Amino acid sequence: LPIYNRKKLPKEIKIPEISKIKETKNTIVLKKFIESNFKDHPGDTKKFWFPTTRKDANKWLDEFMKERIKLFGDYEDAVTDKSNTVFHSALSPLINLGLFTPEEIIEKLRKVEGKIPMNSLEGYIRQIIGWREFMRGIYQNYDEHLEKNNFFNHKRKMKTNWYKGNTGLHPLDHA
């Protein structure tokens, strides 16, 4: 059987860039607050790149539908140094923030049904409903249990190289 969503990314393929969004005044204020109150937490506000308004979020969704959804299915699991997102939408955080509902994204997808490959349509719907919403349901219903349970009985803490991206495992460090 042919494989439709596990293709290796060709070297010559051009991966569309995700548009940079101009920061809002509120984003600037919040970044300063985070920098002064959460200095010991992992992460860096200088690398923040997500839209924080409905208008900008819609631009991202439209851009995904025009530039990346067609090849999403083929390269859904591809790993490369060329891009952090490859042909993914990067919309999940925007759903988490309430800028979209999963239903809105599915409705947009239905409008391009028949115009994009089935593996992209099915693959993306599976990502939104089959994985993202399933995991959301797990967290909503079992959050306290998951926080307290140590199913594998792990004892060691994560080393700082996991947070700093210098594990020696190239795909992990690049992520």
Name what the model sees in each region:
Residues 1-108, 115-118:
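Active-site "lid/cap" and pocket-lining segments within catalytic core domains
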